[in-house]
Amino acid sequence: MIKMTDLLLDEHYAQHKGKHFLPRLKDFMKLLPVVLVVLEGLEVARVVRAMCGPTDGKNAPPGTIRGDFGMSISNNIIHSSEDLESAKKEIGIFFKTDELFNYERADLQFYYAEDEREN
């Protein structure tokens, strides 16, 4: 869990620099601490985005995180990376290399067939 700073948010939202909504978004992101997680798995970005639902909580279906707990497009309850490339960039912004660990999960064989497992 961390408290967001302007420095972190400027780096994370660099593609939105100068857009009218950015100051309000940054203020919202700094209100409370946030929980950061790195997930892994087959097609993890696609799967997590499906679990989150559409960005606008009002239009997200029940059973998704945004559909069950979100009501706003700007005061968003959750963020998920668009794809693996975005995830790698975001992980680099928010995590130090010594905070991440490579390991082989003992239960991997129960989730994926051998030919489906990512290396």
Predicted features by range, described:
Residues M1-N119:
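Non-catalytic terminal and connector segments of soluble metabolic enzymes
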